[in-house]
Design a protein with these regions (language model features):
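C-terminal catalytic lobe of FAD-dependent flavoproteins
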Residues: 369-429
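Glycine-rich FAD pyrophosphate-binding loop
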Residues: 22-45
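Mid-domain catalytic core of redox enzymes
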Residues: 24, 247-373, 377, 385-391
Length: 429
């Protein structure tokens, strides 16, 4: 039996795929362009302060017995911080911060509270529960359409309209709900299983009890030593080749993966080839739309704590450049008399051209800059994506894994779960 597996890309998806298949006895080779494994989830350091490309808190239902949670426990020797997230939104027009996500109790503090109360009741019953029959269907409507119906025009404008636009570079009345929410809703329950986008309905963005991201999920953690030991441990039994993938060549006759070094990796030599890179880049093309992120690490000397009451992040809902600012030591528990804020700024393709080369090289090397971070899942983009999927099917032993290859708005846990689910198709050898 051919036990050889080729994995394209050594980010979270590629490392996870390699881990689950080497656990079953397969011989795995990883092609990765960077010097280190883990992609944008790798822990980097600025003046000794650990950070990732935005906060990388792991949360997944099922507790420590869930298979992918058990993987994290095993690879960290259970050296984990359990996280209770405190998040805020700053509304510039109100000159005030509110809890994130939107809480009903905070409406009383808002200047337009009477209008908001009236709008909230348009699609709710006497107990302020959403009336599902009056709501648009998530996945079949625009973002603005659903959330205006759910919380009213005033709250939508205050918290979501500009934030969503700057995050995706798509106005809410053009943004598909399938793009932003559906990929991740089903994972945020205690039922577990593979993420799915089906039958999402009745989601209420307004919270009536004290709520935060991941609340109620038992396994919400950050490794005490950062994420690097996890990704490194995942690939200890794999062969890692540092090379840049140029794309698939000779697809109709004898397909192979071409690389910058000149080495050709023929599909016929492998049991399976898993690609975790952008599916358009797999074919040497650049057609799928993404928004990117620039991270600015701002170290404040002599200030031990910047945000009130142990808050982790502040979201900025207006037209400021930044979407979110995170005080990383709240997550990492790094001990220092100084604090470091990680400022997230959306960027568009071509942004790299406007920065000095030395700063850009530093940013890319230290996970502070990525032009392709979040897929823009418009109807046109999906059509392009599924065109690539059909093209990939012509190579029988080629499979996709992870958020980039599968064109999903997934977090870290959903990505690892994608690899785990695919590994179940393989018998131990």
């Amino acid at each position: 039996m051919n036990k050889k597996i080729l994995v394209l890309g050594g980010g979270v998806a590629g490392a996870s795929m390699a881990y689950y298949l080497t656990e079953k006895g397969y011989d795995v080779t990883i092609l990765e362009k960077n010097s280190k494994i883990g992609g944008l989830a790798r822990t980097c350091y600025y003046s000794g302060h650990p950070y990732e490309f935005g906060p990388h808190i792991w949360f997944w239902p099922g507790g420590t017995e869930a298979p992918i949670n058990a993987t994290v426990v095993k690879l960290t020797n259970d050296e984990l911080f359990y996280i209770d997230r405190r998040l805020l939104t700053y509304v510039e027009s109100d000159q005030r911060a509110y809890r994130y996500p939107v809480h009903y109790a905070d409406v009383a503090r808002m200047p337009e509270r009477e209008t908001i109360e009236r709008e909230l009741r348009q699609n709710r019953d006497g107990q302020l529960k959403l009336i599902e029959s009056q709501l648009p269907e998530i996945g079949q409507c625009k973002f603005a359409e659903y959330f205006t119906a759910a919380i009213g025009a005033t709250l939508y404008d205050k918290f979501m309209a500009n934030y969503t636009w700057k995050m995706w570079n798509i106005p809410g009345d053009e943004l598909e709900t399938s793009m932003v929410w559906a990929d991740r809703f089903s994972a945020a329950t205690e039922t577990g299983g593979a993420p799915t986008t089906t039958k999402v309905s009745g989601y209420d963005p307004l919270k009536f009890d004290d709520h935060t991201l991941g609340k109620g999920i038992r396994f919400q953690v950050y490794p005490k030593g950062g994420w690097n030991s996890v990704w490194d441990a995942m690939v200890t039994r794999s062969a890692i080749v540092r090379d840049t993938i140029l794309g698939i060549q000779d697809e109709h006759r004898k397909p192979y993966v071409a690389t910058a070094s000149g080495t050709k990796y023929y599909f016929g030599d492998y049991h399976t080839v898993f690609s975790s890179i952008d599916i358009d880049r797999l074919w040497g093309e650049d057609t799928l739309p993404y928004t990117g992120r620039m991270m600015v690490p701002l170290l404040i000397p002599g200030l031990a704590c910047a945000f009130p009451n142990g808050a982790e992040s502040v979201h900025y809902s207006s037209c400021e450049f930044q979407t979110r600012v995170t005080e990383m030591k709240v997550i990492t528990r790094h001990e220092s008399p100084d604090t470091m804020l990680l400022i997230e700024i959306p960027i568009l393709p071509g942004a790299a051209k406007v920065f000095p080369k030395n700063t850009l090289d530093y940013a890319i090397e230290h996970n502070l800059f990525a032009e392709k971070a979040y897929p823009q899942q418009s109807e046109q983009a999906f059509a392009t994506y599924y065109g690539y999927v059909d093209r990939c099917k012509k190579i029988p032993n080629l499979r996709m894994v992870g958020r980039h290859a599968e064109f999903k708005y997934w977090g870290m846990a959903e990505t690892v779960n994608s690899a785990y689910q695919k590994s179940l198709d393989f018998e131990a050898v």
